Each structure stands twice: as structure tokens, then as C-alpha cells.
């Protein structure tokens, strides 16, 4: 069983429980009274040839285990804001990444920087939940969804004022993302089936993206040269979690 398959099975169980606790109708009604979201798309769009940082607040991963023993999400976010992060990515998955919706809520309340919910979304109820948490954007993984689901979820995101970072890993997934109307497209250098990393995945797929797409390279970048490679490939932003924890080079990079 692959990492992704295992995670999605767990998500199906979580969604079933979520629907018992708070039906979608109540979620929908509650979302109508919320303030406007912050503009995630504009925050990460490169206007002058620079590259923006989506800094991930991350405690653990399935492949590496716990990355930060004394995990203080607000302190981590503060450091990332100081080095020039354009947006935050916050893990809310509990079982595999030891994340929490509470981390996301705390960060959205303290900072004016847009916040992306990093989660494995497989059901509309999670999208309403995302809006109620205070997130400005969320991840949609092409490998976890049918094309028709992706199209419908993108429409719901727009209705709720959310932006979607649509994650791809190969040419087929990129084509699906574009065909279904994605405007912010990420390329994950990490294969979610095996968790192996190849930075050339981003470089290769970026060449296939048309003008007007906001592009994000994700995972595996740990050195200044890695960021420069993504910048030269034409990416608007990079999403980095573990690399910021281990690399002084990345913390001192000139972001934006």
C-alpha cells in the first residue's frame, strides 16, 4: 500500500465522522457570515522575476517522523514572516503529519499573511471546514480526485472566496489540472506514492504550463541553488517546509 493510498483511506474515515458532527448545510450557512479572505494568489505571484516563499509550518512527516520536538507553530511562523514569507502553509492532518486545525487558526489570527491549508481534501465538507477555519487557500491534489471532482471543487472554492493550489506530479496530472480550470498549479517533486524526491520534476512540468498560470514548486529544496533553479525555470513561488528547518542558506535567501 502506498503512502497516498493509506492517507486517503484515513481521510475517508475522518470525512464520515465530520459529516456526522456538522452537516454541510450548517457549514454552508455559517460560511456566509465570514469576513473576506486574503488574496493568496496575488501574494505569491511574481511580478519582477523574483520568487516568493510559501513557508510551511510542519511538525512531522510520514517518511521522516517528527521534525520539530518542541513544536511552537506561532514562533515558527514569526521567524518565517521575518525572513520574507509571502504566505504560510499549515498542516492540519493529525495522524500522519501531527498537524492541527488549531495551528492554522492561531496563525491566521496573528498574521496578515495569507494562509494555505495543507490537507488531503476528498469531500466538499472539508472545503466548508477550510473556510470556517479561517484559511485563505487550500491544497487540492489531482492524484486524490477524479477530474469531475476537481472541477466541482474549484467552483466551490471560488464561491467561498478561497484559492486552490492544485498539486500535480506528472504530465497527465498537469493536463488534468489545466483542463479542469486550475489557475494556481503546484508541482510536487515528492512522489506521494513512494515519497522519493526529484527536483527535475518541477523543471520539466513548468515548461508545459501556459502563460497566466501561477506556478509553485513544492518539496525537496534545501539549497540556494535549488531555489535559483526554480526561479530560472519560471516559477512564481516555492513551497518549503523541512528545508527551512535545516538550511541556513534558505533562511538567508532574498525572497520576493
Swiss-Prot record:
It catalyses: 1-(2-carboxyphenylamino)-1-deoxy-D-ribulose 5-phosphate + H(+) = (1S,2R)-1-C-(indol-3-yl)glycerol 3-phosphate + CO2 + H2O. PROSITE patterns: IGPS. Gene3D superfamilies: Aldolase class I. The keyword Amino-acid biosynthesis applies. CDD domains: IGPS. One of its GO terms (molecular function) is phosphoribosylanthranilate isomerase activity. Keywords: Amino-acid biosynthesis, Aromatic amino acid biosynthesis, Decarboxylase, Lyase, Tryptophan biosynthesis. GO terms for biological process: L-tryptophan biosynthetic process. Pathway: Amino-acid biosynthesis; L-tryptophan biosynthesis; L-tryptophan from chorismate: step 4/5. Its EC number is 4.1.1.48. Disulfide bonds: none annotated. Signal peptide: none annotated. Pfam families: IGPS. Belongs to the TrpC family. This is Indole-3-glycerol phosphate synthase. The lineage of its organism: Bacteria, Pseudomonadati, Chlorobiota, Chlorobiia, Chlorobiales. The gene is trpC.
Amino acid at each position: 500500500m502506498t503512502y497516498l493510498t493509506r492517507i486517503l483511506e484515513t481521510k475517508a474515515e475522518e470525512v464520515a465522522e465530520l459529516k456526522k458532527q456538522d452537516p454541510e448545510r450548517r457549514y454552508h450557512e455559517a460560511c456566509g457570515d465570514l469576513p473576506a479572505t486574503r488574496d493568496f494568489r496575488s501574494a505569491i505571484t511574481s511580478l519582477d522575476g523574483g520568487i516568493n516563499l510559501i513557508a510551511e509550518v510542519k511538525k512531522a512527516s510520514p517518511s521522516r517522523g517528527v521534525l520539530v520536538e518542541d513544536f511552537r507553530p506561532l514562533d515558527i511562523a514569526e521567524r518565517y514572516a521575518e525572513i520574507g514569507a509571502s504566505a504560510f502553509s499549515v498542516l492540519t492532518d493529525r495522524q500522519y503529519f501531527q498537524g492541527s486545525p488549531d495551528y492554522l487558526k492561531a496563525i491566521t489570527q496573528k498574521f496578515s499573511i495569507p494562509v494555505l491549508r495543507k490537507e488531503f481534501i476528498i469531500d466538499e465538507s472539508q472545503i466548508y471546514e477550510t473556510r470556517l477555519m479561517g484559511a485563505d487557500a487550500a491544497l487540492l491534489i489531482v492524484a486524490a480526485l477524479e477530474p469531475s471532482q476537481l472541477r466541482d471543487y474549484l467552483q466551490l472554492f471560488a464561491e467561498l472566496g478561497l484559492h486552490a493550489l492544485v498539486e500535480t506530479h506528472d504530465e497527465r496530472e498537469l493536463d488534468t489540472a489545466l483542463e479542469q480550470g486550475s489557475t494556481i498549479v503546484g508541482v510536487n517533486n515528492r512522489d506521494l506514492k513512494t515519497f522519493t524526491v526529484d527536483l527535475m520534476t518541477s523543471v520539466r512540468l513548468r515548461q508545459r504550463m501556459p502563460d497566466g498560470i501561477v506556478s509553485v514548486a513544492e518539496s525537496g529544496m534545501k539549497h540556494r541553488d535549488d531555489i535559483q533553479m526554480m526561479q530560472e525555470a519560471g516559477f512564481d513561488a516555492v513551497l518549503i517546509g523541512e528545508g527551512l528547518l535545516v538550511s541556513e542558506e534558505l533562511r538567508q535567501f532574498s525572497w520576493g
